[in-house]
Curated annotation (Swiss-Prot):
One of its GO terms (molecular function) is nucleotidyltransferase activity. Keywords: Antibiotic biosynthesis, Nucleotidyltransferase, Transferase. Catalyzes the displacement of the beta- and gamma-phosphates of CTP by phosphonoformate to produce CMP-5'-phosphonoformate, an intermediate in the biosynthesis of phosphinothricin tripeptide (PTT), also known as bialaphos (BA), a natural-product antibiotic and potent herbicide. It is an enzyme of class 2 (transferase). The gene is phpF. PANTHER family: BIFUNCTIONAL NMN ADENYLYLTRANSFERASE_NUDIX HYDROLASE, PHOSPHOPANTETHEINE ADENYLYLTRANSFERASE. It comes from the Bacteria. This is Phosphonoformate cytidylyltransferase. Its EC number is 2.7.7.93. GO terms for biological process: antibiotic biosynthetic process. The lineage of its organism: Bacteria, Bacillati, Actinomycetota, Actinomycetes, Kitasatosporales. Disruption phenotype: Deletion mutant is unable to produce PTT when grown in MYG broth supplemented with 0.5 mM phosphonoformate. The keyword Nucleotidyltransferase applies. InterPro entries: Cyt_trans-like, Rossmann-like_a/b/a_fold.
Length: 184
């Protein structure tokens, strides 16, 4: 990628319930495209989580076992462990269920990086376009090799799961008792 194609500030977002290797691929692809990466954590609390018709399970309490702070630790740990310096990284709440609020959390003049796997990805892209945000679709795919649901199910069923997440995330899950919470 040439210097002219690198954004000054890029915004990328995810629920990270928990952050897995698919998320890490996405986050690192975003980091390659900008000098400063703003990572928005969606559904930051139960009061900024609404039902999404294109993905109804994403708002359920059992789909959101990790707090904002725990996910902050996951994002920070995974990205710095992968070589992204703290100086380039900003982590913010990102209540995309309320698009009119996003300008209060992330810069409107940044480039917003997205990936599209399904109707939910297209719905988010439409929301960003409606807000007049500059977007870049990094890829469109139909197959997700790993998902947060798969990680949560593996933990709940007592199956191996650490291979699905970066080492820093496995540490946060264990240290914060997220694995015990999911199994309860």
């Amino acid at each position: 990628m040439s210097a002219e194609q690198i954004a000054g500030t890029g915004v990328i977002h995810g629920r990270f319930q928990p952050l897995h290797l698919g998320h890490l691929e996405y986050l690192l692809a975003g980091a390659e495209r900008c000098r400063t990466l703003v990572v928005g954590i969606t559904n930051p609390d139960p009061w900024t989580t609404t039902e999404e018709t294109t993905d109804p399970e994403r708002g359920l309490p059992e789909s959101n076992p990790c707090t904002f702070y725990e996910r902050y630790l996951m994002v920070e740990g995974a990205l710095t462990e992968a070589g992204v310096s703290h100086e380039r990284l900003r982590i913010v709440p990102f209540p995309h269920s309320f698009p009119e609020r996003l300008a209060h959390y992330a810069p409107a003049d940044a480039r917003y990086f997205v990936t599209v796997y399904d109707d939910w990805g297209d719905a988010k892209l439409d929301r960003f376009h409606a807000l007049g945000l500059r977007t870049e679709v990094m890829w469109r795919r139909t197959d997700k090799p790993v998902s947060g649901g798969r990680v949560r199910r593996s933990i709940a069923e007592g199956q191996p799961w650490e291979h699905l997440v970066p080492p820093a995330v496995a540490r946060v899950v264990k240290e914060c008792g997220i694995d015990e919470r999911i199994r309860a």
